[in-house]
Amino acid sequence: MTNNMNNYPLLSLINSPEDLRLLNKDQLPQLCQELRAYLLESVSQTSGHLASGLGTVELTVALHYVYKTPFDQLIWDVGHQAYPHKILTGRREQMSTIRQKGGIHPFPWREESEFDVLSVGHSSTSISAGLGIAVAAERENASRKTVCVIGDGSITAGMAFEALNHAGALHTDMLVILNDNEMSISENVGALNNHLARIFSGSLYSTLRDGSKKILDKVPPIKNFMKKTEEHMKGVMFSPESTLFEELGFNYIGPVDGHNIDELVATLTNMRNLKGPQFLHIKTKKGKGYAPAEKDPIGFHGVPKFDPISGELPKNNSKPTYSKIFGDWLCEMAEKDAKIIGITPAMREGSGMVEFSQRFPKQYFDVAIAEQHAVTFATGLAIGGYKPVVAIYSTFLQRAYDQLIHDVAIQNLPVLFAIDRAGIVGADGATHQGAFDISFMRCIPNMIIMTPSDENECRQMLYTGYQCGKPAAVRYPRGNAVGVKLTPLEMLPIGKSRLIREGQKIAILNFGTLLPSALELSEKLNATVVDMRFVKPIDIEMINMLAQTHDYLVTLEENAIQGGAGSAVAEVLNSSGKSTALLQLGLPDYFIPQATQQEALADLGLDTKGIEEKILNFIAKQGNL
């Protein structure tokens, strides 16, 4: 992909923020137009995150124009909105490789650029890291500034408020920018608010404010009166949220128009030299400047390749995704059981819960980006006699590990975890791979862990987890299902596997959706294939039988080898005194980079060809070809 840079005369001059800072202020609106158009052209040809970046064009330009990056430290939360940042910081020509194997990362990444201060991917980490960076700069007597940009979704997480509370207490110099692209927080945006933001962020006001405080500290009654007067002024002139952030110890400014580049530059210029923790609330529109994305910001959040002229996203007419299989199952259950409750931490669309939320609104809860709360909320529902189902990505369940143990498992409560995006996820890379859930759940007492090999198995396992009366987890991958026939729901026998094919010498013990590769290989190798179904409790009887009747056992899973399902098999063999040779195939001990799912599996030797080579090499090493 190549963009015709003749269409972008100003942007073509910008190879770093230093180039940007050479422009006159009156050139910035044109640069924003070009940057937005370039972003649309690039992402439409490569796929990626679009709507968020379209909404932060003016903010990104203003930040790099006012702050002396990379000396000043700019931290993006999550990173979906950081595509314009990448374009302005020397990676414009590499945008055609974003989210692709060997290409630039979909999120800010420290190893990629000195302008990427913090590697991100998960939400709500920016303020905590930013505070640490600001404290370090303060202790080194560095004059650098620290700026954190966080969205209105990410700031709902408890970790963000923990960091705000700590920052206010430390009174460290830093700026937190709330990029508010929803109508729910505040609609007070206009000329008056922009003007007031300039006043309250200006050096004259801040000097008078700080000087008065030093004097009035000696006269507590007057000091308290003036503090309440200032809070009242901000509450009236700005928004109700100002009081919250002021109480946390921040000087609140806003909301201001996040698409008015002149006002942003003026406000940020004022705020750059303010002391103590500062909070700037800006209002933006997700998808700004591209009508289809403005109309459907959720649909255009992450997009495949598409035609930007028509604005139509390609439809997927292939087999249903595992997320849809889950969503359909949840609706089917809710039709019969008013006590089933669906819970998601801000992943309604991704987890396949749109239809459920519309048809059963009283049984649906989106708790926002609050994974810890989601799990303990489910605990309370289970105690109250309901049947909670927590739909959560594998990578995000990591954020609620203590709640999984302390609140669910210890009390042995019937909470079902529908774990989406388990295994290799593809283009989002290391921060989003579902590589660890089997390992970190398998050691928890009372847990039932199931690994479906196709969509029908997935449905049956969800139903089994829903009926079993214990903490249960069903892990399934990102992407399309196999296309098998769906059968009526029935509870599976807990901890029992199913024998798929009988062979000789080699037995492949499959955990999950790599079963087609195992079956294809079994014909070549005359191998036995067992779909293990359950990681915990594991089918000890089947493992011991296979160890007695075969020379080699091979375990197959899309999870880290360390502590994974193969390790469970090794533990059974060890405790039973079996010396059968065991080959554990799974994800290696490093963070797996971005690539398509197929590319990643091939690179890891977990496609059919790679599995065959690993098995044959293993047998050769045993001296029995």
Curated annotation (Swiss-Prot):
Pathway membership, UniProt: Metabolic intermediate biosynthesis; 1-deoxy-D-xylulose 5-phosphate biosynthesis; 1-deoxy-D-xylulose 5-phosphate from D-glyceraldehyde 3-phosphate and pyruvate: step 1/1
Molecular function (Gene Ontology), one example: magnesium ion binding
Lineage: superkingdom: Bacteria
Biological process, per Gene Ontology: 1-deoxy-D-xylulose 5-phosphate biosynthetic process; isopentenyl diphosphate biosynthetic process, methylerythritol 4-phosphate pathway; terpenoid biosynthetic process; thiamine biosynthetic process
PROSITE patterns membership: TRANSKETOLASE_1, TRANSKETOLASE_2
UniProt: thiamine diphosphate binding residues: 80, 121-123, 153-154, 181, 290, 371
Keyword RNA-binding: no
GO cellular component: cytosol
Cofactor(s), by name: Mg(2+); thiamine diphosphate
Cofactor note: Binds 1 Mg(2+) ion per subunit.
Ligand binding (Mg(2+)): 152, 181
Keyword entries, A-Z: Isoprene biosynthesis, Magnesium, Metal-binding, Thiamine biosynthesis, Thiamine pyrophosphate, Transferase
Catalytic EC class: transferase
Pfam hit, one: DXP_synthase_N
Catalytic reaction(s) noted: D-glyceraldehyde 3-phosphate + pyruvate + H(+) = 1-deoxy-D-xylulose 5-phosphate + CO2
Transmembrane segments: none
Role played: Catalyzes the acyloin condensation reaction between C atoms 2 and 3 of pyruvate and glyceraldehyde 3-phosphate to yield 1-deoxy-D-xylulose-5-phosphate (DXP).
Family: Belongs to the transketolase family. DXPS subfamily.
Subunit text: Homodimer.
Protein name: 1-deoxy-D-xylulose-5-phosphate synthase
